[in-house]
């Protein structure tokens, strides 16, 4: 059997879109067949039917009305599918044979622009990644076709670099070079929910000069070869999916990875910059506190500022000075916010214009927005800060575009472009003439209706119109007997009425419909001319939109600073950060006003380089550490900060190792994840970085963990290529002995007050280490049963009585002394990387850290030694006692070993 002609056409088109669900236009429906139909029926809850296709079995089929397609497309795209829209590209009335069809657009998660599914305040990015294995380099290109943003960068081909950029932009779709390392592809897949496609090297490397010149013109000539190749693939992908060149993508913003603060994936999550950890929503994040912007453009820009803090002191100062000027003039800033409030999303309107799907209401929104610009410009006219002066100077009032739209487009135009009612009277003489003819025709229809009522005596007689039957005379069945015989021609019978026509009515109908059809067609053509004229000025419009967005951010930061009692920080590059009465901006927002306890911080590259913070759980150690990082970050985006005074040293990177989590999909345990994060920090932090380490080593045995934590502290403080500012929270109180032993280490703790065997968390950071962890008290607060609490106290008392704290102190001193005897050269020399297998996965830990940790713990086999004192005398007992490795034992093992030794010693007396 042979396929039907229509089904042959379907398969020919589907062959080129195998990775898409093909929406195949048949009349007023989009139909899907075979596997596409089965997938769509399942995902969209549609009825699966069948259609004869020429084969023995009917083709599985389902369909949706074309006029309601957007919601169905959005649901599929949200689930990670690509949808190819196949339209009839010729009029069925004039088609010879089967109607020609072709795919006019491919809609993907990264190219979908429908406002019902794309968040107003978020960019919808798509990313390409290119790699050169020989040079060990990679390049990335990123765009949001709805706004016209197009960015690119290049750097070392390292997993961390790529994953950090992915976490920063959070793209909905990623196109990879198919020869990219498989392990890296796996890591990318586990890191992001983005739809991932793979393309051959030719897709990146062929015709890049031609493609980029066509899209960007001479601007592309100065790009590096690496950037050209990733950008080439991205532009090609846009052309492949949109089927047109998008004029709003007309420039490439090439940025360097060192232009902005590096914040790795883990740190973005831990600091909850744009979404909270628990619900992945904006509420409870830093963005939630800071975002009181007036425009969608400003909100997206602020999000990007938070994701990309500045590292250039001069640029930070420019923003801070602009914020300060508006902060100091409340009336001025209120006026500015009011003027910005009525400005629509110019960037996304331009995206619609570029994509040829902007309607008349979009142009009215654009006109309204442009009309606000002179007021905005006037408000900041007398501002003195450099940034605000630049905004005023460069802000284009776009008067010519405003006047064009003001005189051409109706204030309340039709949503459907081909239905007319778009163009104002007086703009085009031919439109005015056709409207007059149409109006006269309607007057005639009204006159006819009155005349027929008088003639028949039927007061309810009316003349109506629909697209199927045209004009008609409708008479209710109750008045049917009053119709003069032979006056009307019956056209349609309804349940309660009859519809008729007359030769005279059909004659005027032809004239009216001819005028209406011609009017709609002419209005549509003129509208397209106006839209194209606006598109010719897209460069000016994009520049203006960016200034409005930045101005909104500056105004917003001034407003938020006033609302939350933030202060302007000072900036330095000396390496010392001083914060007086610092507060966590999110935490203080969610607890009753006035209850947050502020804290001071001094951290530098000298005597306060690494702060060891001890204290019980729930006391506020993690909040304090995060607050220092967030205050630093806020300063570097140009924001005022929550403190009474702050002098912030610019940092190039923020790293955090906070909280316990595993990576089951990646096959990594909690401890494995912790070690990977620590390894990443030790390899990538610099002397200008800020590092937060919380409970390093807690995922393993006590002395393993203590040894690792100790050696990490030494490595950070003694490696002359590192010495980064570090906040180190721990429950290993033994580490507090490092103050005075290692230069730069200082002890701090969270103050706790004991009242009637209960503890009160004072949330205050004070100098000196904590003397205990209060773990049982915290367990009691958490609601652990009293029986468990009481038994825990008994066990703790026995352990504390029988443990030999003095011996432990001595051991710690001896281990430290052995380290001090090491030559300084070995401390400051270049550190080699050693690969260590941990739980069947690989972690790279600096060899120096491994060797230092090993000093505090002997080989595991020693733990298994069974002492048989029945065969030895006192000398042997002393010898065996001296060989017991106390550092390798957990508290219970130490107690059992001590008990056995004491018992045997008594037998020898």
UniProtKB/Swiss-Prot annotation:
GO molecular function: ATP binding; ATP-dependent DNA damage sensor activity; damaged DNA binding; mismatched DNA binding
A Pfam family this chain is assigned to: MutS_V
Residues annotated as binding ATP: 615-622
Coiled coil segments of this chain: none
Cysteine pairs bridged by disulfides in the record: none
UniProt GO cellular component terms: cytosol
GO BP: any one term: mismatch repair
Alphabetic keyword roster: ATP-binding, DNA damage, DNA repair, DNA-binding, Nucleotide-binding
InterPro entries found in the cross-reference section: DNA_mismatch_repair_MutS, DNA_mismatch_repair_MutS-lik_N, DNA_mismatch_repair_MutS/MSH, DNA_mismatch_repair_MutS_C, DNA_mismatch_repair_MutS_clamp, DNA_mismatch_repair_MutS_core, DNA_mismatch_repair_MutS_N, DNA_mismatch_repair_MutS_sf
Listed SUPFAM superfamilies: DNA repair protein MutS, domain I, DNA repair protein MutS, domain II, DNA repair protein MutS, domain III, P-loop containing nucleoside triphosphate hydrolases
Function per UniProt: This protein is involved in the repair of mismatches in DNA. It is possible that it carries out the mismatch recognition step. This protein has a weak ATPase activity.
Family recorded in the similarity comment: Belongs to the DNA mismatch repair MutS family.
Name of the protein described by the UniProt record: DNA mismatch repair protein MutS
Gene designation: mutS
């Amino acid at each position: 059997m042979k396929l039907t002609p229509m089904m042959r056409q379907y398969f020919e088109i589907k062959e080129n879109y195998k990775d898409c669900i093909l929406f195949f236009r048949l009349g007023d429906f989009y139909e899907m067949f075979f596997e596409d139909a089965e997938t769509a029926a399942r995902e969209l809850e549609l009825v699966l039917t069948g259609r004869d296709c020429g084969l023995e079995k009917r083709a599985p089929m389902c369909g949706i009305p074309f006029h309601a397609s957007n919601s169905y497309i959005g649901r599929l795209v949200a689930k990670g599918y690509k949808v190819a829209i196949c339209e009839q590209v010729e009029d069925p009335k004039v088609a010879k044979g089967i109607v020609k069809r072709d795919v006019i657009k491919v809609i993907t998660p990264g190219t979908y622009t429908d406002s019902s599914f794309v968040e107003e305040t978020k960019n919808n990015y798509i990313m390409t990644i290119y790699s050169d294995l020989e040079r060990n380099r990679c390049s990335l290109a990123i765009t949001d076709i709805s706004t016209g943003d197009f960015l690119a960068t290049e750097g070392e081909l390292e997993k961390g670099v790529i994953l950090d950029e992915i976490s920063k932009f959070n793209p909905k779709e990623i196109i990879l070079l198919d020869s990219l390392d498989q392990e890296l592809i796996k890591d990318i897949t586990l890191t992001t929910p983005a739809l991932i496609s793979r393309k051959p090297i030719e897709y990146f490397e062929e015709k890049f000069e031609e493609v980029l010149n066509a899209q960007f013109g001479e601007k592309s000539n100065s790009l590096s070869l690496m950037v050209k190749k990733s950008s080439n693939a991205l532009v090609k992908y846009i052309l492949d999916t949109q089927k047109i060149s998008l004029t709003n993508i007309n420039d490439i913003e090439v940025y360097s990875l060192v232009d902005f603060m590096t914040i790795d994936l883990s740190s973005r999550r831990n600091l909850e910059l744009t979404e909270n950890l628990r619900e992945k929503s904006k509420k409870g994040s830093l963005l939630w506190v800071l975002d009181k912007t007036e425009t969608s453009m400003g909100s997206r820009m602020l999000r990007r500022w938070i994701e990309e803090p500045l590292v250039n002191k001069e640029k930070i100062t420019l923003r801070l000075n602009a914020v300060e000027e508006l902060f100091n003039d409340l009336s001025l800033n209120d006026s500015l916010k009011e003027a910005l409030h009525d400005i629509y999303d110019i960037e996304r309107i331009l995206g619609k214009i570029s994509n040829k799907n902007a309607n008349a209401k979009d142009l009215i929104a654009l006109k309204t927005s442009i009309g606000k610009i002179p007021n905005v410009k006037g408000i900041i006219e007398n501002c003195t800060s450099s940034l605000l002066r630049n905004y005023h100077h460069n802000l284009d009032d776009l008067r010519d575009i405003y006047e064009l739209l003001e005189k051409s487009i109706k204030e309340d135009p039709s949503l459907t472009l081909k239905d007319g009612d778009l163009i104002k009277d007086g703009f085009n003489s031919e439109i005015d003439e056709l409207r007059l003819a149409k109006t006269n025709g309607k007057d005639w229809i009204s006159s006819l209706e009155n005349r027929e009522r008088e003639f028949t005596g039927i007061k309810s007689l009316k003349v109506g119109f629909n697209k199927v039957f045209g004009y008609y005379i409708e008479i209710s069945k109750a008045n049917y007997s009053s119709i003069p015989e032979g006056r009307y021609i019956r056209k349609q019978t309804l349940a309660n009425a009859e519809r008729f026509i007359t030769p005279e009515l059909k004659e005027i109908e032809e004239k009216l419909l001819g005028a209406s059809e011609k009017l709609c067609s002419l209005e549509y053509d003129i509208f397209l001319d106006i839209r194209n004229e606006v598109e010719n000025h897209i460069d000016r419009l994009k520049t203006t939109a960016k200034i409005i967005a930045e101005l909104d951010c500056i105004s917003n930061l001034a407003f938020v600073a006033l609302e939350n009692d933030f202060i302007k920080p000072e900036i330095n590059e000396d390496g010392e950060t001083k914060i007086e009465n610092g507060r966590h901006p999110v935490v203080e927002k969610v607890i009753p006003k006035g209850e947050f306890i502020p804290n001071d911080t001094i951290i530098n590259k000298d005597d306060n380089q690494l702060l060891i913070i001890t204290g019980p759980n729930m006391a506020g150690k993690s909040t304090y550490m995060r607050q220092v990082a967030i205050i630093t970050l806020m300063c570097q985006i140009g924001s005022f900060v929550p403190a009474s005074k702050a002098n912030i040293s610019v940092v190039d990177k923020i790293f955090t190792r906070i909280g316990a989590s595993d990576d089951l999909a990646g096959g990594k345990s909690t401890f494995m994840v912790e070690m990977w994060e620590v390894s990443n920090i030790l390899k990538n932090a610099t002397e200008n970085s800020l590092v937060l380490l919380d409970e390093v080593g807690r995922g393993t045995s006590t002395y393993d963990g203590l040894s690792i934590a100790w050696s990490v502290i030494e490595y950070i403080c003694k490696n002359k290529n590192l010495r980064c500012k570090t906040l180190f929270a721990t429950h290993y109180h033994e580490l507090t002995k490092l103050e005075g032993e290692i230069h730069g280490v200082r002890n701090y703790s969270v103050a706790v007050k004991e009242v009637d065997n209960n503890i009160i968390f004072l949330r205050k950071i004070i100098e000196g280490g904590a003397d205990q962890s209060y773990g049982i008290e915290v367990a009691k607060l958490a609601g652990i049963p009293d029986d468990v609490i009481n038994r825990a106290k008994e066990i703790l008392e026995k352990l504390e009585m029988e443990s030999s704290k003095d011996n432990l102190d001595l051991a710690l001193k001896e281990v430290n002394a052995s380290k001090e005897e090491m030559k300084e050269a070995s401390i400051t020399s270049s550190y080699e990387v050693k690969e260590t297998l941990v739980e069947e996965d690989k972690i790279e830990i600096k060899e120096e850290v491994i060797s230092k940790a090993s000093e505090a713990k002997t080989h595991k086999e020693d733990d298994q030694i069974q002492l048989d004192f029945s065969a030895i005398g006192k000398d042997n007992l002393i010898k065996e006692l001296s060989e017991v490795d106390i550092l390798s034992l957990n508290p219970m093992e130490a107690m059992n070993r001590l008990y056995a030794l004491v018992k045997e010693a008594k037998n020898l007396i």
